[in-house]
């Protein structure tokens, strides 16, 4: 009897364990789920947690590809009699987490963050999936195939309104610090998606409360239909004129009409269907196929030629052959981003990879020799500040603080002025390029309206104006880029003189990047060692620092090579001031040269930051002068009274004097001139 009871208990425990094991495969889906390139959604967001709370494969039969519904098991609270609850939903059904988790589970249905998330059944290619909204668009948490041999298509995971490169664009750059190239590519793909290819946003949200407006591409499609109808009427009127008037029946006019008509049709409404980059079927349009790439690619091509023709020997010169097809324009922006980091002492751009953490080195670039710099080991410097050992630190400002602690205010002011002017001018170029690119996309979008105007004499002036704006916006960034290339060339020569740079190429997966290490030239190496850039790199490595007490606290400052550093930095500052004043008129110069609109009104002013600093200094100076005037000694009051009495007797002279003082006070309180 006892043996039979023990056998029953063993069987019950075994069945329960098998049941629990059969439902323990949470996170399993009938078909593979898409994985984001960075793994962010699966690891750090609620999306990954919801995936690990759903089981599809157990119990068996949920992966049937011939049913139009999806069956899944949603996790219950720990300690429940059943590990999960089974639900079956059809395509288009939507349920909140709180509706699926009804057992007061604090991690799901009772969680204030997760309970209002809506799960919707929808198709992703050949899969029927249970999807949830994420920051990168709807993403599936459980899927099953609708046929026996599903096509290997992965659903898009990027935001429906934003280009994919906004998330993965940094992978196409060869510079460890990259933001300008990423901004350009992100904006380009986003504009392309908004204006031409359309987006993947549904017309209504999941609650069916908000109806989104039609995409720009839809509106342009209707616009092209109207233009096509107008062109048909134009052809009919030309045929009537040719039939009624023999002057229109000449071979010359007919040939000219055919050429102009084909030109207008091809560049305005397009010919023949074509798969565009977004995968949507559209007509082949001359403006999209030839005009837009030509207009947007003129600036980086022109500037890259100037960059390669000058500059320091090997500094921030990347291998163009390693850029992927369609992303070679990153070479210009990588050169700019790299110099920003190098001038400001970002150590990630310097070859500090002793332990191989950056990836596998695949070789060295041309320029520079392989002889290491003597006495340039940062690990042997004990007196250096702790901030110099932090990865990714901008060491330039740490060194400037060291000069401040040693009392060299002029070096600090000159260094800050150089960095502010340099960053202001580069920010102006980036914003100018982006504004011109947006203008080109807008002009391309409305091209179906302006291109047909070339057919009529009365409207041809509008077409000429449209062409002028397009060409000007394509050439203006090229002119400004030439100015930036000249600026950087002068900086390289003034900061590093004849120093050489050795490039280290690395690969980590599909990502390729490079670092640069300063090398002494084989001829006239003393000139390189006396340069401002070489001495700054020595300060970055910890040389030239001394520790002393300030009251009761130990501080670290720089007291070596102060005179030579000041002379070299003032030389760099002279170039900065020259380009600062020239940058005020570069926008107007580019507009006059290209006979187009001036973009300075909608771009970041190259002198904006400096002007704000000047206004702040003027305000502080005027405030201090007013404060000093308000503290007049008490014994001076009788003199003030006598002055007022004399002022009444003098009449007009007193009024003029008082008016002048009031004017000075008003200008002081308003932040007057220095």
Swiss-Prot record:
- A Pfam family assignment: TrbL
Q: Mind telling me which residue stretches traverse the membrane in this protein? A: 226-246, 254-274, 409-429, 436-456, 469-489, 562-582
Task: Note down the stretches annotated as region Disordered.
Answer: 363-384, 624-674
- Residues in the signal sequence: 1-24
Which keywords fit this entry according to its UniProt record? Answer: Cell membrane, Membrane, Signal, Transmembrane, Transmembrane helix
Q: What's the main place this protein lives? A: membrane
Q: Membrane topology for this entry?
A: Multi-pass membrane protein
Localization (cell): Cell membrane
Listed GO cellular component terms? Answer: plasma membrane
Family, similarity comment? Belongs to the TrbL/VirB6 family.
Q: What is this protein called?
A: Uncharacterized protein RT0031
Organism, as annotated: Rickettsia typhi (strain ATCC VR-144 / Wilmington)
The uppermost taxa in this organism's lineage are: Bacteria, Pseudomonadati, Pseudomonadota, Alphaproteobacteria, Rickettsiales
